[in-house]
């Protein structure tokens, strides 16, 4: 089974594209098996949270990082799990 890695994704997103367009920077930590999966997760999350299309999101860099460098508490807690059991 593959090991889940932590990626830091940096980029810009276009906020309020119809009235006063403004490009804002973002930095997100994502857990994924591959770089491509991390990109898809970022596109999906930003698109659903901010109602953005993919053309309104510019990815500048995707880096694999050590779990010790992560600042997001949710990612830290997920990384510390040894196993995950889904019930129901």
UniProtKB/Swiss-Prot annotation:
GO molecular function: large ribosomal subunit rRNA binding; structural constituent of ribosome
GO annotation (BP), single: translation
Cleaved signal peptide residues: none
Keyword annotations: Ribonucleoprotein, Ribosomal protein, RNA-binding, rRNA-binding
Cell division as UniProt keyword: no
Protein's UniProt keywords contain Ribosomal protein: yes
Superkingdom assignment: Archaea
Gene Ontology, cellular component aspect: ribonucleoprotein complex; ribosome
HAMAP family attached to this UniProt entry: Ribosomal_eL20
Subunit structure, as described in the record: Part of the 50S ribosomal subunit. Binds 23S rRNA.
Family stated for the protein in its record: Belongs to the eukaryotic ribosomal protein eL20 family.
Name listed for the protein in its UniProt record: Large ribosomal subunit protein eL20
UniProt organism field: Aeropyrum pernix (strain ATCC 700893 / DSM 11879 / JCM 9820 / NBRC 100138 / K1)
Lineage, top ranks: Archaea, Thermoproteota, Thermoprotei, Desulfurococcales, Desulfurococcaceae
Gene behind the chain: rpl18a
């Amino acid at each position: 089974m593959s090991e889940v890695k932590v990626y830091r994704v940096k980029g810009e997103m276009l906020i309020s594209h119809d009235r006063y367009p403004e490009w804002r920077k973002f930095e997100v930590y994502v857990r994924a098996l591959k770089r491509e999966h991390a990109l898809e997760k970022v596109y999906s999350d930003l698109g659903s949270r901010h109602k953005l299309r993919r053309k309104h999101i510019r990815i500048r860099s995707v880096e694999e990082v050590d779990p010790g460098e992560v600042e997001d508490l949710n990612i830290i807690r997920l990384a510390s799990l040894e196993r995950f059991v889904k019930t129901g």
